[in-house]
Regions:
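N-terminal segments that cap or nucleate solenoid repeat domains
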Residues: 2-48
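Short, well-ordered alpha-helix to beta-strand connector turns
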Residues: 13, 22, 31, 40, ...
């Protein structure tokens, strides 16, 4: 089946299946579910609501929607766009990069081995969580409420931006005695709660 027919399948059925190769997927329509499979995939969304299972590989997701949820495993993930509400869940190793704007964005990276989070954007609420062995978090942006929970044994947190209230927590994952990492805060806030347990 050609790419055009596969993309039209999403428009009319709300489902789009990729391969285990490097796919270029356009998801345009009211909404639905994307199963990208393995490989290095590029996904362009223009929908009311979509959930994308990006699997393994280095994946790039771009576009806009009222609701966007991405579920990723191993490999780097790059997300860019404008969404009213966004959720990103990453369970395997690899970096996660987000560039965009939204009313609210929730990022949860639980890959054990390694994987940084790089955030650049703005939202009324930014909720960022990283749990694993090794990771840095770099935040540049603005939000009404910013919450960053950094739970790794090794890694630094850098915050550059502003918010109505900023809550930053740096803690250890599974080895307190060997944990290390700094918090670098360069920002403004109506209120700031900054805590380090390493």
């Amino acid at each position: 089946m050609s790419k055009i027919l596969k993309d039209l399948e999403f428009t009319f059925t709300g489902k789009r299946y990729g391969t285990d190769g490097n796919d270029d997927i356009d998801a345009i329509g009211f909404g639905g579910i994307i199963y990208a499979g393995k490989g290095h995939d590029t996904i362009t969304v223009g929908t009311f609501a979509v959930t994308a299972y990006t699997g393994d590989g280095h994946d790039f997701v771009r576009g806009g929607s009222a609701y966007l949820k991405i579920i990723d495993e191993n490999g780097d993930l790059d997300v860019r766009g404008l969404n009213a509400w966004g959720e990103i869940e990453k369970s395997g190793h690899g970096d996660l990069k987000y560039v965009g704007a939204s009313a609210a964005i929730k990022i949860n990276h639980t890959g054990y081995e390694y994987g940084n989070i790089n955030y650049s954007g703005a939202a009324i609420a930014n909720i960022i969580t990283r749990k694993g062995a090794i990771s840095n978090i770099n935040y540049q942006g603005a939000g009404g409420y910013n919450q960053i929970w950094h739970e790794t044994n090794t890694g630094n947190m850098t915050f550059k931006g502003g918010g109505g209230y900023n809550k930053l927590v740096r803690t250890w994952f599974n080895s307190y005695q060997n944990s290390k990492g700094n918090i670098n805060f360069e920002g403004l806030g109506g209120g700031n709660g900054i805590f380090s347990r390493v």
